[in-house]
Amino acid sequence: MQKNTKTYYAELRRKLKEKGFDTSRTQTYDGMLRVWDGIRMLGDIGPQGEFYCNSNDLADPHRKEQIETIMQCIEEVNRS
């Protein structure tokens, strides 16, 4: 990744907020960016754009759609 982590996470936060997600930096896992839907934690984004989530969420159509939206945001920021 060419961008530094702080700039990368700032861009991700902005993009995710546009899509209705909340974010926070985690105190563990090396300060990853945690993504929430306002109520439930959906996963963590690492500094290289990797997304960690519960694989069981992929079986729920609503959660799967949310995860796909998060992945699209990551991809858009990585391309910019």
PLM segments and residue spans:
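Short intrinsically disordered terminal tails
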Residues: 1-3, 75-80
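Negatively charged, low-complexity tracts enriched in Asp/Glu with abundant Ser/Thr
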Residues: 1-29, 61-64
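Residue-level detector of alpha-helical secondary structure
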Residues: 13-17, 68-78
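Generic detector of low-complexity/intrinsically disordered segments
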Residues: 14, 18, 35, 44-47, ...
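Ser/Thr-rich, low-complexity intrinsically disordered terminal regions
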Residues: 25-40
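Intrinsically disordered, low-complexity regulatory segments enriched in Ser/Thr/Pro
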Residues: 40-66
